[in-house]
Structure formats: C-alpha cells, structure tokens
C-alpha cells in the first residue's frame, strides 16, 4: 500500500500525505481501536516519499500502536486542550521538509479532516511555506482496487452477514421493535465472527 501510495503521490506532485480519518489511519497502519469513538483528540499519520511513515498520536495510544508495523511514533502528552498535537505535527513536518512542499489532505468527496478547523488554520499559518491540498482522489484511487487479501476478508464478512440474515427470522417475534431486532442482529454478527458493527440502519 505504501509503495502504491508513493507512486500516486509522485503523479500528483505531493511530497507528503497527511492522514487523519479513522478509516484511512486504519487502512495504512492496520490499527483498529475504540479510541476512534472519542473525537476529543486527533490522530495523525504522515506519509512521505523518502521517509518511513510517522504517526503523531496522543500518548495514551502509543503502547497499542507500537504493536503494528509503524515504528516511528511521535506522541504528545494528552489531554492538552491548548495544543492537541498540532505543535508535534508541525515539528514533524518541518523535520521532513523545512522549505516549501505540497501536503495532501483528506479534503474532498466523502472525506474529512479529523481535527478542529482552528487547528488546521493554525497549521496553515505556522507552515506558510507549505501548501495543503486535496488528496482525496488519490486515496479513492488507491482504495478502489482491492488486494487478494482484502477480497478474501470482504468475502468472509459478506458470508457472515448473509448467514445472519438467513438465521434472523428464527429469533424474531411479532411484538419486537426495530431496535430490538437490530440488537439481535448485531449480537449474531459478533457471534459468527464479525469484529464489530459500527453502523446499522433500522
């Protein structure tokens, strides 16, 4: 994934890619956690053309992230409402490239920056020689083509979900609400091997 990302970065003339959203952080690091359920503190991943990936994260997550393949982790002491990682992120960017460069961010279709607007504006101001540009199309292009391993995992979870749908009528009663039915389905998904159910419409 990193190799393909760098090729796309070269095409887009990007020297760095700043990842902030949980699903893309998970995609590049393999790290999955309920830390994402709290929007209080951001987590950053910085990919560059010529350096190993660097994670910039709150100190509470360092031990867990060290179990992944990411070896460069810059952590700040958190909670720190006055500076939740922005100075650490800024210093990390400058350590890679102190002069002008283009940094891709998740700013386009179905994307978002998982940081406050004030912090992003502060980052732009403090790194005036650097430009932050939309790289969502790069990430979309990268993620649309699945590897054999990804396809295998998709087949597995689709099979689990299909089995739950098939079995669901056996566990339902006439007087149950939609919420109760959804809760039954969530439990059955977990029982059959799903990791979790983040979203279910009812």
Features from the language model and the residues they span:
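N-terminal accessory/capping or targeting/presequence segment of soluble
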Residues: 1-87, 91, 159-164
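Active-site cofactor/co-catalyst pockets and adjacent glycine-rich loops in catalytic enzymes
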Residues: 22, 28-32, 39, 49, ...
């Amino acid at each position: 994934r990193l190799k393909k990302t760098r090729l796309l970065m070269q095409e887009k003339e990007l020297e760095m890619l700043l990842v902030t959203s949980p699903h893309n952080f998970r995609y590049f690091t393999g790290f999955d956690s309920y830390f994402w359920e709290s929007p209080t503190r951001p987590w950053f991943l910085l990919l560059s053309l010529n350096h190993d990936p660097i994670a910039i994260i709150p100190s509470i997550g360092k031990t867990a992230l060290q179990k992944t393949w990411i070896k460069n982790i810059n952590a700040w002491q958190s909670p720190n409402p006055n500076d939740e990682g922005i100075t650490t992120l800024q210093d990390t960017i400058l350590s890679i490239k102190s002069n002008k460069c283009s940094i891709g961010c998740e700013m386009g279709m179905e994307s978002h920056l998982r940081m406050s607007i004030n912090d992003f504006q502060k980052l732009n101001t403090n790194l005036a020689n650097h430009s932050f540009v939309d790289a969502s199309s790069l990430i979309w292009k990268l993620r649309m083509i699945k590897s054999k391993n990804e396809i295998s995992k998709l087949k597995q979870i689709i099979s689990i979900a299909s089995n739950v749908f098939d079995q669901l009528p056996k566990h339902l009663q006439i007087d149950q609400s939609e919420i109760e039915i959804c809760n039954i389905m969530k439990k059955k998904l977990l029982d059959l091997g799903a990791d979790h159910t983040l979203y279910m419409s009812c």
